[in-house]
Each structure stands twice: as structure tokens, then as C-alpha cells.
């Protein structure tokens, strides 16, 4: 019937409009979620230390994939290291960044430098870290520098004493940073005041920050 066809045609047009409206709504939510994730990523500093191609021998031949060692930090004392593996380089970097954010830890700092000298070790990697005076800058090379910069350290002296392997150096640097303690923690542990425990340099820096 012509009337029925017109009614059916009108109903199908309305359905199409409703579907288009729903798709636009869903797309808007996805866009908002994607923009929110991009804003969260933009708040952090990301450094790719190394990318390697690895292979796996299977029955049909070799399967190649990529690994990425990524450092992520907020530049304000939070830093993390992640290791990602995927068939494509961008996916490996993304996985490494996600793992790095899960491994965040806080680095105790006073006036832009670390609180005391430490030595970090991981496998054959050995990294020595020392506090530095304001204006010194980040004296570090190789794979240790991205870790210190992402953590927000402004003045530090470092030296690699062991293997030059980037993975070992990064994890040795992280091990050293995790050994750092605040002067308040040392004073509480020893049952003394901060003035009795902390060096004069740290006390002057704390006084300058409070002022």
C-alpha cells in the first residue's frame, strides 16, 4: 500500500536519525575520554632510552618484535621506569610508558638536588650520585640523565662505575634514588633533631625554601 510504504519509510528515516544521534553521542564520549588521556599524558615528561628489535624462533620461522625502555616523570619528584614489548615500535613505547606510570616513586629533594650521596647497583651497572650546589646542573651522561631529568632534579653529580648497558644503568640509577631518605626520617630513626643530623648545606636550603 502506498500509505503503508510512506509510513514505513518515515519510520525508517526516524530510526536512521536516532542511530546517527546515538553514534554522535558515543563518538563524543570517546573523544572526551581520548582528550582526557592526552591531557594526563601531557602532564608528564617521557623519555625513550633505548629501542631494540628482538626475535623469537618458532616452528614457522622467526617472529620479530620491539622492546622499549621508557622513563616517565612529572618533573616534581615523581619518576618511574617501564619496559614495553610489542610488534610495532609505537605500541612498545606506549606499553613502556604505561608500566612506568605504574612504577612511580617519589625522590626526596632539597633545593633541586638530592639529600645525600648514594650508590645504586643493578646487575653489572653501578651509578654514583652526589648532591651539587645550585647552578651546577645535571652532570650525567648516557642512560642516567633521562632518569634524573624526568625526576625534576636540577643539580646533581653522577658517574657510572660499571657496565655501560643502558638497561643496567637506568635500573642502577633508580636503585640509588630509592635509597634516598629525608632528613626528618633519619632524625626520627636516631631520636635526634634535624639540626643534629642534617648537613649545614641542607639546613640553609630548607631555610631558603621556607623564607
From Swiss-Prot:
Keywords: Ribonucleoprotein, Ribosomal protein, RNA-binding, rRNA-binding
Domain annotation S5 DRBM: ranges: 44-107
Residue segments, region Disordered: 1-41
GO molecular function: rRNA binding; structural constituent of ribosome
InterPro entries: Ribosomal_Su5_D2-typ_SF, Ribosomal_uS5, Ribosomal_uS5_bac-type, Ribosomal_uS5_C, Ribosomal_uS5_N, Ribosomal_uS5_N_CS, Ribsml_uS5_D2-typ_fold_subgr
GO biological process assignments: translation
A Pfam cross-reference name: Ribosomal_S5
Record-annotated disulphide pairs: none
Gene3D superfamilies (UniProt xref): 3.30.160.20, 3.30.230.10
Entry GO CC: small ribosomal subunit
Family note: Belongs to the universal ribosomal protein uS5 family.
NCBIfam families assigned to the protein according to its UniProt record, in alphabetical order: rpsE_bact
Entry's free-text remark on domains: The N-terminal domain interacts with the head of the 30S subunit; the C-terminal domain interacts with the body and contacts protein S4. The interaction surface between S4 and S5 is involved in control of translational fidelity.
Protein function: With S4 and S12 plays an important role in translational accuracy.
Record note on quaternary structure: Part of the 30S ribosomal subunit. Contacts proteins S4 and S8.
Protein name in the entry: Small ribosomal subunit protein uS5
